[in-house]
Design a protein with these regions (language model features):
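Extended, charged catalytic domains and RNA/DNA-binding interfaces, predominantly
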Residues: 1-129, 133-135, 148, 152-155, ...
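Short, flexible active-site loop motifs that bind/organize anionic cofactors or intermediates
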Residues: 13, 106, 181, 198, ...
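Hydrophobic alpha-helical scaffolding
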Residues: 76, 105, 109, 140-144, ...
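Active-site micro-motifs of SAM-dependent methyltransferase domains
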Residues: 101, 171, 218
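Conserved active-site loop/cleft motifs that coordinate metal ions or position small ligands
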Residues: 127, 163-166, 207-212
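Short glycine/threonine-rich loop-to-helix capping motif typified by GTGT followed
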Residues: 140, 175-184, 220-225
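Short acidic/histidine-rich active-site segments
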Residues: 158-184
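Mid-to-C-terminal alpha-helical segments outside catalytic/metal-binding sites
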Residues: 186-225
């Protein structure tokens, strides 16, 4: 097997795009993934800072171009209205690169069963992340075992083919800032702790491989041209 390492260049929000035409320039420089917003409201879409606004006309134009170019569309940080309207405006598989399930933790960045089923119906994937407040609002549950429980919940709800990992490990957030990850998963070096928890829950090696990378890889192969 090939031992080549692949990297996807992505953008966590496109608020800096001055106009729709700049997307082509970014694509030409290698960008193959983007979310429309990082929580903020911008000229293309609304993130979680708004409860009322959604996808704009310019946002619909961007989505059309992303689909035509073969770019991965990421719904992480989009608010519920934008989430729904992106589904209405597109036809390709969609991803949430990092986020968890509201059923286990009712955090604003997590997703309802209805949203998870929408991802499944579009043959997409959600990546479960290890940020402690996204895992549980009860401190003793902010563990790698409960992170595995989020994966297990999603797998049982929409199928193991639609859940992956979106660790969202940030080694630098800004001067004096630190990220609060769950106990047992403080950095990428702790990844095997998560996989061990999945084994304890009865997941096969094949299913763990899907969760590790194969599910996202399936979507990438379908979209990227």
């Amino acid at each position: 097997p090939s031992k080549k390492i692949g990297v996807i260049i992505g953008m966590e929000g496109i608020m800096q795009l001055e106009d729709v035409n700049h997307l082509q320039e970014l694509f030409d420089k290698g960008v193959r993934h983007a979310g429309l917003t990082w929580n903020e409201v911008n000229k293309y879409a609304a993130g979680l800072s708004s409860t009322t606004e959604g996808l704009t006309t310019l946002g619909k134009d961007i989505l059309k171009r992303m689909e035509k170019l073969g770019m991965i569309i990421d719904l992480a940080h989009a608010n519920p209205r934008t989430f729904n309207e992106v589904f209405e405006a597109t036809s390709q598989p969609l991803i949430v690169s990092h986020g968890n399930t509201k059923a286990l933790c009712n955090h604003i960045r997590n997703y309802t069963d209805e949203q998870l089923n929408m991802i499944k119906d579009r043959n997409g994937v959600i990546g479960i992340c290890g940020i402690a407040p996204f895992i549980s609002d009860i401190e003793e549950n902010q563990t790698v075992a409960y992170m595995a429980a989020h994966i297990d919940y999603v797998a049982k709800l929409i199928g193991v083919d639609h859940v992956g990992i979106g660790f969202d490990v940030c080694y630098y957030l800004g001067e004096g800032e630190t990220q609060n990850n769950v106990e047992g998963f403080q950095n990428i070096g702790d990844a095997n702790n998560l996989f061990n928890e999945l084994q304890k829950l009865g997941y096969s090696d094949d299913d763990i491989e899907k969760i590790k990378y194969k599910n996202f890889f399936r979507v990438f192969k379908e979209i990227l041209k």
